[in-house]
Amino acid sequence: MIAKISDLADVQGGMVLSRKEAKNQKQSAFEYSRLTLRAFDENGNINRSELEIFHACESLENALFTKVGDVVIRLVSPMYPAYIEPGYENILVPSQFAILRVKGCAGIIPEYLRLCLAQKSVEERILSLESGTAQKTVKIKTVLDLEIPLQPLHIQQQAVQIDLLSRKRECMYRELIENERILTEYLIEKMIGGTNQ
């Protein structure tokens, strides 16, 4: 079965932060962690060290913050969709992003929605629909109109598990390669008599 994203999830664009920004830190009554474009990686992870502090002049609405179960996308290509897990909630979402919240009876799990949005074919479809824009921006309407395959829940869960295991393996391989590089440098330095002797 094929379903439109608009039938499966509510989509809300992030907030234009310049309207709520404190003129200086002394006027700042509220501080929030906020998403940045570089905080998202191609695997759907959010890098905490790339989040920024936003100083607001007033309290901001809860609807503009991440919640567990949200799928957040960048509104520039590539979208790098991310599933919000525990520990990543209450992060301010600026206007360069959109939040997708699965509707209660939609028959889709949020992790599967993220997985569908992360597919190369979806990214290519979005790029072809947004071809007139020079900066490769993604309109919320384009996302709402996307059609994705809606599999039975057990298939969705299996696909999510396969993706999760694959991403864990990739992370372990990267760590192994880095450790191998460090070991090789150390051994070569020892063999040729490096400066640290």
Regions found by a protein language model. Give the residues of each.
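Non-catalytic DNA-recognition/assembly elements of restriction-modification systems
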Residues: 1-26, 150-197
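Sequence-specific dsDNA recognition surfaces
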Residues: 6-23, 40-68
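Short, surface-exposed loop/turn microsegments at beta-strand edges and helix-strand junctions
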Residues: 24-32, 52, 64-66, 84-96
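A structural connector/turn signal
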Residues: 60-61, 87, 133
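Generic structural signal for buried aliphatic residues
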Residues: 70-73
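A short beta-sheet element
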Residues: 75-115
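A short glycine-rich beta-alpha junction/loop motif
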Residues: 91-97, 132-158
